[in-house]
């Protein structure tokens, strides 16, 4: 726009010149330019907004002889349009009229008051209630990536460093940022192609010196030594870029961001991008929330509890000590069903985490304060409920929850029970909270009554029957006397206007009232806004303990939720051990069990030094994938601190969970199904350790039989012999069932099925040893494959099983087009049936014919 501005600015009206000056500072963002009751957009902004919002594209004036494109949205409905644009990854600049149109000689003064971007949202209307909305900045040093993450709505700020593109992809999958900041020179932009809201920043946004200064200013420290980030240059640079961007968009110093937390990958069980996708932790394969692990496990009472639970599921702990803290808390909450009363109280708690962020940003709305008031008044009752708890961790949380009687009292006295949505139109503060505000409101609301009172009083004082009090816009308030009585006016009456048949006067009292009345409404609104801002300042003074309280309430909610889930879903507390083992008795898949109409069949699993790999065979649809996924889900839940779906679980240290499951092309990345499969396999073979859990499903199926078998064999052998990770290796290559003969730490298991009346019944039970067959043709039959194809497949199977090297061809292979439309020749049995005259057969002849046809069918 700067080139356009310099070329055409002199040709424009002063108003458009003002717009161009503002737009030049925000070239990559949509500028909402306030004009009266509308926000207008011009040029390319107008075209883009018209396309995205489906609004009318019109024009205003000309530029270089060409009409200027224009689109607009009503001021009162702008929030909805802004929300839609931000959800599409756009950033919106709000430019308001700040000058008085009546006093302006040129165009009304306008300035940018807000910049709304996908990653810096704090307004409740724009946010997903149960999901974090994150701004991520990435700095790159070759294969070392510095990551800084800001949850501006929740008040969390984290940094970390990861090495390698795979690790970066894993973190992107975990964080799912709403907006990503990278340098214009970032070398891995292809990795971000599937993410909206990618913003390229100038290289100087990532300068180390600037970053250090910004962060020290934010946290009011001389240096960053207390944040455990020594030597993390990449992360500090990312943090500096992030803070510079956030402060510019918010027009604020972000007072609710009080500390910087360093995340270490080694503190949590690492889930790579493929594992998060395949295990459907909080997003299913269709991109939805339903039928995910979080969907089953989240019955939290509060939105902030739901968000914390999702963070826990996506980042299971490595520390068994921390896990046991959570387990012990859940056990106590289950005693005498103590979680029930706690859950009911928590259901009345507002989203104080996000409310406090809006308070700090001075963007909290009246209903935010009403919800905060209701939350704070509940805290004493919550404390009483927690007095009986003995668990150390729960008592620590109770202490952090604390009570805030001063703020609760202030908000109870100040805020109406059901206040309006915005402070702009008043009516937020209670009657009696402020004497001056009450007086101003009274003047504004009761002006008519007051004038009648003055009129009555003056008539009694002067005994002048023609006296009346009136008002007009030109002369304001007045006392009017008829011409015959005007010479009897008291000495304190000051002549204001002479009419043909009357005289109008003003008194000092009426003049004082006039000054108050004419400005009372605007003064009342102004004073109410000032008092409202003072309330926000009072809350901000206790922001730190209030934020600690909100986080403690969130954790209390998650633990209470886990207790409810344990009871409702029949979950057990897993035993944690330092031994390398994973022992599950009666394990169940937490999601499949809830959505299936049939009773879920539980299964056992035993991995330890003796058997570190299971080769899993069995029919398609037999339950191999479910068995593998439920194992990973149980591990994740266990290390989140939750109880798990099983009869008994003993689990040792786990550092990573890997999955190679499913199949799909990466069309955007130009990778075939097999290439995706091999990339995921390579990642596992490079990064898995002896403490990892590895799920491998059908490795090698995307290529030729011999290539696939060779790769599957080599991968399984490498995992068993070199890495020795806990591995579940599902395959249809029955040759792999020979591995236990040469590798003592490998065992065979299979899922069972049985044939009954030419149909297949899946038993979904796991047994030792290899499967006897795959039942692939029976599954094809269940899927509705045409009978003639099934018959042909059965013939070819018999030939292959009898040792034939290839299917026998009765005729030269037809061309593809001929084959598509070829008529299937009837079998000998079908021919006999077509010629049969059923009505002419006796019962004995019919029975003999049936036996004959059966024999022909078996021999064909």
Curated annotation (Swiss-Prot):
Q: Using the chain's own numbering, where are the disulfide bonds? A: none
Record's keyword annotation contains Ribonucleoprotein = no
Give one Pfam family, short name only: MutS_V
One GO MF annotation is: ATP-dependent DNA damage sensor activity
Q: Which GO terms describe its biological process?
A: mismatch repair
Record PROSITE patterns: DNA_MISMATCH_REPAIR_2
Keywords carried by this UniProt record: ATP-binding, DNA damage, DNA repair, DNA-binding, Nucleotide-binding
Q: Which SUPFAM superfamilies match?
A: DNA repair protein MutS, domain I, DNA repair protein MutS, domain II, DNA repair protein MutS, domain III, P-loop containing nucleoside triphosphate hydrolases
* One GO term describing the cellular component: cytosol
The reply on keyword Kinase is no
Entry binding sites for ATP: 618-625
Q: Which CDD domains match?
A: ABC_MutS1
What is the recorded function of this protein according to its Swiss-Prot or TrEMBL entry? This protein is involved in the repair of mismatches in DNA. It is possible that it carries out the mismatch recognition step. This protein has a weak ATPase activity.
The protein's matches in HAMAP family, at most eight in alphabetical order, are given as:
MutS (MF_00096)
Q: Which family, according to the similarity comment?
A: Belongs to the DNA mismatch repair MutS family.
Q: Which NCBIfam families match?
A: mutS1, PRK05399.1
Q: What is this protein called?
A: DNA mismatch repair protein MutS
Write down the species: Hahella chejuensis (strain KCTC 2396)
Give the classification, highest ranks. Bacteria, Pseudomonadati, Pseudomonadota, Gammaproteobacteria, Oceanospirillales
Its gene name is mutS
